[in-house]
Every structure is written in C-alpha cells, then in structure tokens.
UniProtKB/Swiss-Prot annotation:
Cofactors (names): Mg(2+)
Transmembrane segments: none
Pathway: Cofactor biosynthesis; thiamine diphosphate biosynthesis; 4-methyl-5-(2-phosphoethyl)-thiazole from 5-(2-hydroxyethyl)-4-methylthiazole: step 1/1
Binding residue positions for substrate: 49, 200
Species the sequence originates in: Desulfosudis oleivorans (strain DSM 6200 / JCM 39069 / Hxd3) (Desulfococcus oleovorans)
Function text: Catalyzes the phosphorylation of the hydroxyl group of 4-methyl-5-beta-hydroxyethylthiazole (THZ).
HAMAP family: Thz_kinase (MF_00228)
Similarity section: Belongs to the Thz kinase family.
Catalytic activity of the protein: 5-(2-hydroxyethyl)-4-methylthiazole + ATP = 4-methyl-5-(2-phosphooxyethyl)-thiazole + ADP + H(+)
Keywords of the record: ATP-binding, Kinase, Magnesium, Metal-binding, Nucleotide-binding, Thiamine biosynthesis, Transferase
UniProt record, GO biological process: thiamine biosynthetic process; thiamine diphosphate biosynthetic process
Molecular function in Gene Ontology: ATP binding; hydroxyethylthiazole kinase activity; magnesium ion binding
Pfam families: HK (PF02110)
Name the UniProt record assigns to this protein: Hydroxyethylthiazole kinase
Amino acid sequence: MNEHEFAQKTIAIRRKVREQRPLVHHITNFVVMNITANVTLAVGASPVMAHAHEEVKEMAAFAGALNLNIGTLTPYWIDAMVMAGKVAEQRGIPIVLDPVGSGATPLRTGAAKKILAEVGVNVIRGNASEVMSLFADKETVNIRGVDSLETVDAVRHEAGLLAGELEKVVAVTGPVDIVTDGTRTLEVHNGTPMFGRVTGTGCSATTVISCFCAVEPDLLVASAAALGYYGLAGEEAARISNGPGSFQAALLDTLYNLPEKIIQEKLRIREVLP
C-alpha cells in the first residue's frame, strides 16, 4: 500500500471501531489506568480495567482485545495476565503486550518473557530497549545506552529478527515507529516530542493499537494504522496546546475529533521493501 491507501485504511479502521465499540480489556498499571481508559473512549472503543483473579477469565472471554501492561508489577498481576491471556488465546482474541521497563530489572524482564512463553501474544509494543531486552539473554540491559545508540536501520533489523523468531507483530516506537512481522515492515513518521513530556503516552499508544486490533484482522496494518493515527493526533494536539497539561487534554480531544481530511493529508505510513 502507498501512503494514500494507508490513510484510507486508517480511516476505515477508525470507522469500524466507532461502529462496533469493541470492549478492550486492560490489565495495566496504576499510573495510566485513567488516561488509557479515556484514550480508549476517545478512539471509540469501550474500556474495562479488571485484574482480579476471580473475574479476569470471564472479562477476557467477551473482550474484543486484551491489553497487557507490566508497568506496576506484582506476582499477583503477572498471574492475572497469564490467566486472561490463555482465555483470550483460546478464543482468538488479539493480545497486545506492552513490556514497560523490560530490561530495567529482572522482575520486569522475567515477567515479559513469562507472558510471552505462556500466552499467545499477537502484538508487542515497546521502545527499542524494551524490545531488545526480550531478544537478549541478559535479564537487564543498558536502557539509556540502547535508546541513544540505536539507529532506525538497526531498530528495523532487530525488530524484524525478533518478530520472525517469535512469530508476532513487533512495534518499536521512537522518532520513527517501526512495525514488522518479520516479513513485512512498515514505518510510521507521525508523532511529536510532546509525547515525552506527559506520562502514559507510550501506554496510550498501545491502547490505540489494542482498539484497532479488535476490529482489523491484519494486525500488522492495524498496529501501524493505530500508531499513525495516534502520532498524527499528537501532532495536532501539540500545535494547539501550550504545555504538557493542555497537551494531554488536547490529545484526548484530537483523538476524538481528528478529521478524516487531516488523516488523508498528513498520515505518513510507508512500507519498507526488503
């Protein structure tokens, strides 16, 4: 697909989300529960935040997508993610993993790898260091070093290797977002530095991916379209805001109101040929 076709596909997916209003089951962290629930609503889906062992299986069973986020971990929550994930996998419900901080501590890295080993995760969304930690033998990596040294070409190469090895869609977010399944690779050139000034913007990107995956069977395209849509909303929000506080509010408004004309004109998704 060319950029125009990706824009049309993104518009079609957003329309479908708003028509179907899929339930997106989040087992996520305390820091971002409120903002990611609101992002889900702004995109057009329905959020539920449920992590109690007594209900996660039931909730996952009738969700349109399952969003697993390891930002504030306990062993109890890890078990809840595995329980919900197994039900979602059995029912063919897309599972999106955000390995927040993987590589920073053995707990986080171990939790991410445990979920990947025991649950049929479909999409992984993280920054370069988080994604590399899933590929490395070590339990910790130099997060600052990885983020500063990686080039777009290197990230694209390593993400492709990981996606091919795990047979999953891998989305690495950064100045240029890379989305790959090991065979096809897409680049997303939308976004804003303001994402780095407000907490939860990465987790919110994963939420939009989950919403789009709930209605679009091609999870590679759904993930790239979600990141393009989210990045473009961020660009427009940054343009009309005056700082982090107004940006956060403007981002919700823009996710809700982003005109299709702007998507057609400004979405920047392209396929990278091997």
